[in-house]
Amino acid sequence: MTTLASSIEHKTKHLAAPFENDENPWMKKYCCQCKSCKMSVPVQPWLPRFFVFGILCPVFWLVNLLAWWFLQYWQPHELEFHDLQEDEYPGFYEYEAITKRTVIPIKEEVLQEIRVMQNFSDSNSEEYYESKDGMPSSFLNVNTEQVEDENDTLKKYRYAFLKKVAHDVLESHDLLRKTFRDWNLRSLLGLLIDSILIIFVVLLCKKSR
């Protein structure tokens, strides 16, 4: 019986719909597609390393500053959104999966948007809030018996999904620029301190003569 149960559980995991796992469009993280962000992503992990190397060789601080200027200002850095294909939008299958699973985790901003739209359509949704790994998450519960027009409801979910995508893109763009700014301000501060120390040493040498 134990072997049979484990076999059934194993098959069940393989039969699980993609929406219920990692391909859930509500869980996917969308990033800015501007040229600046695309070029900055592979460079980002090197910023703290170059800062540490700069303590021994200040040239690395200059490299950080040049990369900051070239990637964050010289390159086009206007927000660009992910080109969503039709099959990437939550459809009827995803909507049914939501109602069957009762709850799905979504961002607080998206939950607020859906709540406002549902108030306009006189539908009564119940919101559940749970915590995962110590971080609060928002959950949406939709009762299909209270929805009269499926097409209208699907449009509302898609609109909320677009709001979520826009939020993700803006957040990723701002976070990447903030990371570059923080590390390069540290590099600039290191160069200033080194310059002051060099000037101080030169003045001391002149006085000693």
Swiss-Prot record:
Topological relation to the membrane, as annotated: Multi-pass membrane protein
Modified residues (Phosphoserine): 121, 123, 125
Residue stretches spanning the membrane: 50-70, 185-205
Keywords: Membrane, Phosphoprotein, Transmembrane, Transmembrane helix
Keyword Membrane applies: yes
Subcellular location: Endomembrane system
Cytoplasmic side: 71-184
A GO BP annotation: conjugation with cellular fusion
Induction description: Induced by alpha-pheromone. Repressed by the ALPHA2-MCM1 repressor.
Record bears the keyword Membrane: yes
Chief location category: membrane
Lumenal side: 1-49, 206-209
One CC-aspect GO term: endomembrane system
Residues that bear Phosphothreonine: 153
Primary role: Required for receptor inhibition of inappropriately expressed a-factor receptor (STE3) in MAT a cells. Inhibits signaling by relocalizing the G protein beta-gamma (STE4-STE18) subunit to intracellular membranes. May also be a mechanism for the down-regulation of the mating pheromone response after the zygotic fusion event, promoting the transition of the new diploid cell to vegetative growth.
Protein name per its UniProtKB record: Protein ASG7
Annotated source species: Saccharomyces cerevisiae (strain ATCC 204508 / S288c)
Gene expressing this chain: ASG7
